């Protein structure tokens, strides 16, 4: 499994990494986001949405579980599964995971059994007040190629 690591010093750098990642997004991509409360998962998602050209305000779907944004070059399905009652709760996630948009799933470890085998796992950890350590782990060929492409760009701190 290929890994990429970055250290960002402010939310704008976190968004820049997300925006670049979005530039290579394809329909059916699934990105999982892990990190403590306030680590920057929603900040990452905001940058990703900007990269897709989404103009609507992006915020955490904590109480709705899934927010759909359809005004970009690809639909974005932002999921926060932290409040799901149990892993077997049927929200039709397969339709999202194998659909025409990109899924960003916060707290994805809570629905591990429902996730596609291939995905990009993103872990965001606090490294100071505004500093973050961001780790991408590619699971599957599609995401190995995505990480390879991202590693070629030096316009973000790596």
Curated annotation (Swiss-Prot):
UniProt binding sites for ATP: 38-43, 130
Additional notes on this entry: The four proteins YwlC, TsaD, TsaB and TsaE are necessary and sufficient for tRNA(NNU) t(6)A37 threonylcarbamoyladenosine biosynthesis in vitro in B.subtilis.
UniProt name for this protein: tRNA threonylcarbamoyladenosine biosynthesis protein TsaE
PANTHER family on file: TRNA THREONYLCARBAMOYLADENOSINE BIOSYNTHESIS PROTEIN TSAE
GO MF annotation, one: ATP binding
Family statement drawn from the similarity comment of this UniProt entry: Belongs to the TsaE family.
ATP-binding keyword on record: yes
Upregulation: Expressed at all stages of growth.
NCBIfam families: T6A_YjeE (TIGR00150)
One family name in Pfam for this protein: TsaE
Amino-acid positions noted as binding Mg(2+) in the UniProt annotation, renumbered to this chain: 42, 106
UniProt note: phenotype after gene disruption: Cells lacking this gene exhibit significantly reduced growth in rich and minimal medium.
Domain of life: Bacteria
Oligomeric and partner information: Monomer, homodimer or homotetramer; in equilibrium. Low salt concentration favors oligomerization, while high salt concentration favors the monomeric form.
GO BP, sorted A to Z: tRNA threonylcarbamoyladenosine modification
Alphabetical list of InterPro entries matching this protein: P-loop_NTPase, T6A_TsaE
Keyword list, A-Z: ATP-binding, Cytoplasm, Magnesium, Metal-binding, Nucleotide-binding, tRNA processing
GO CC terms in record: cytoplasm
